[in-house]
Structure formats: C-alpha cells, structure tokens
Amino acid sequence: FVSREDCVVTQYLAGGKKTLPELILSIDPLETLPKFGVKKWGTGPEVNMKYELVYDEAGTYLGQAAHYPVFVESELQDKGYVTMVRILHTGGSRNVEQTEGSKKIHIRGAQAVWILAKTAAQVEMGEMEDFPGVKAQETIDAVLADLKSAVAKYRTKEGSWDYERALALQKEQQRETYGTVSFHLGEQTADSGEEGVEKETNTELLQRQKNTPQMLQKLMEQIYQTGRYVQAACAGYSAPRLCGLWTGEWNPGWSGAYTMDANV
C-alpha cells in the first residue's frame, strides 16, 4: 500500500511457517527497458537524460537519481527525481552482487521481508553537465532520512517491523476520504437475480453475471466502488493526479492518453 501517514510505498512478504524463496532486488538500467527511447515519430528525448544507480555495500537500500533530459520547450529543464528503496528482513542472509550495469541484493532464507520505497521530485537539480552533483546527493539523503524515520516508527522490540500498525494508520486516513461518497442502486431481490449477492466476492459476482441476462446492480456498485478507491488512492490531498497503468515499457502504446483523472 501507499501510506498517506508516512508517504512511503510499503510491501510485506511473509513465509509463514516456511522461509521465503530467494529474493533478488535490483534496479535495471533504464536503457534496458522495452521501448526506451523509441516513439512513433522517432527517438524519444529520454535517451538524453542522465541517471545514477545508488546502493550501499550492506544491501540495506538501493535507488536511482535522475536528471530529466534537456530539450526545447521542456517543462522539466534542470529538474529531476530520486527514488530510494529501504530493505528490512528477519532471518536469513543478505549480500550484494555486482552485475553488468547494476548490482543485485540477494536475500536468502528470510522469514519476512519489508520493502519501503519513496520518490521525491527535485525542481533544482542543476545543469545537466553538473549531474549528479550536490542537489542529487541532498535529495538522496533527504529521502533516506524519511525512510529511516518510517523504519524507526514501526520497529518492534523483537527486531521486526509492524506492518499491521502502519496499515492501520493508512486505513484510518483513507477511510475518511473514501467514506465521503456512497453509491447504492437499490435492494437486491430474487426477481432481479441478485438474491444473496451481498456477501459475494467480485469474482463470484462476475461469474453470476455470466449467467444473468440483466445487468447486476450489485456488480455495478462494486465496479464504481473499486474505481473510486483507485482514484482516492492516487489523488492525495492536493491537486488531482493522473493514475496510469504500468506496463513494463518506457513508451507504452497508449502513450499517456488513457489515464484516470482523480478529479472525475
């Protein structure tokens, strides 16, 4: 989940009674992403951006600092961003292995792994020829400090990390936004083919719809609620954001045209 409380992306992997499979964490060089620098009309400006991959020798974090490409009429001249990822685990071992173009963090035999990530924009990254420079390092340090605070806030006496407590604080804030609107199309009855649907999962509702000639009101409600949740989750409290779908490509086919406006 993305925490409104702490402004970090939080992931939790647990092996239960068994240890987790080997986990490999790395950031691929941007130019290895499909369609990097490839656009319908020719070469994309991203081929002229600069970036550096950031790691520590102990494998506690990894990240990327980048300077946006410079071109005529760019709104991102002398700007950039930093994304850092903090890695925690209980049990097992961790080591860093050098690979061509990057490093990989290997975690073996862990009982649980927590991955915290944060991205920050830098509107004064400086001249392209000076990158990475002072501003990039200052932004890296600031993001790592925020991640360190999030780690300390939920660290338990046993040395693990309290994911449930972090999630509870996020739910509390998200519930306030999500609960401002309700949507109900009426009572479900046997005549409408919807008797007993209140406790059905989305998967069960979709299966029921396949066997029901008329549109299920409950399914329409669930589609609306799911879409509203996504929009609320990506909007924050400030100006609306656009929520795009990540396809693993640098220049996806929709090229930014099909996004969800959180201000709908």
PLM segments and residue spans:
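Aromatic-residue-lined binding/catalytic grooves and analogous aromatic/hydrophobic interfacial grooves
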Residues: F1-V264
